[in-house]
Amino acid sequence: MLHIDAYKAPKFLAPGHRVTGERDQNGRARGLGHTVVIAVQDDHSRLVYAELHSTENAVNVSITLTRAAAWMREQGCGAVEAVLSDNAKCYTGHRFAQTLDELGARHIRIPPYTPRWNGKLERFFGTLEDEWAHGRTWPNSATRDRALSSFIRYFNRWRPHSAAGGRPPITRVQQDRRHDS
């Protein structure tokens, strides 16, 4: 089963008051918008596939899910049987349903106001915020965004996870491959 959701990271032109200590709002850029990180996480291994997009819409979500399913198969996670998502418009429309049909997966919708159902991915977003978005001082959001793929690689291959016995997620996939033989 795969979990899918999006995280909005604000765009910025320079470090903010948390870094500079300056609370003067006169030079602050407003209305720059957000960069959307659409993330897909394998339920068992906790492997994550993520892409940056300008908006969270049905097209971007469907493209990301298709690429994520192919990438997960390459890593050894197997075929997608189900996809867990919230009830945002981009997950309830025809385009997303068509993508699920192409993957041969059923759709599991989270009841309204129950984000704990998607707790594994929500925990990943907490880690993403702490270790990627705010983990260091970025000169601007474009530089931060370029570092996402490196962070995801680190998260999947080297970062210890308590749910995996202190090992990175990729080891759970590799362990499962050894047991299947």
Question: How would you name each of these model-derived features?
Answer:
Residues L47-E51, I108-I110, H134:
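Short small-residue beta-strand/loop micro-motif enriched in glycine and branched aliphatics
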Residues D5, V40, R46, L65, ...:
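Mobile genetic element proteins and their domesticated derivatives, centered on retroelements
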Residues E56, E74-G93, P111-Y113, G165-I170:
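Acidic/histidine-rich, metal-coordinating catalytic segments
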Residues M1-A39, L47, I63, S181:
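Mobile-element integrase/transposase regions
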Residues G27-R28, G33-H34, E51-G76:
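Active-site beta-loop-alpha junctions of metal-dependent nucleic acid enzymes
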Residues A79-N87, D101-K120, R136-P139:
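RNase H-like polynucleotidyl transferase catalytic core
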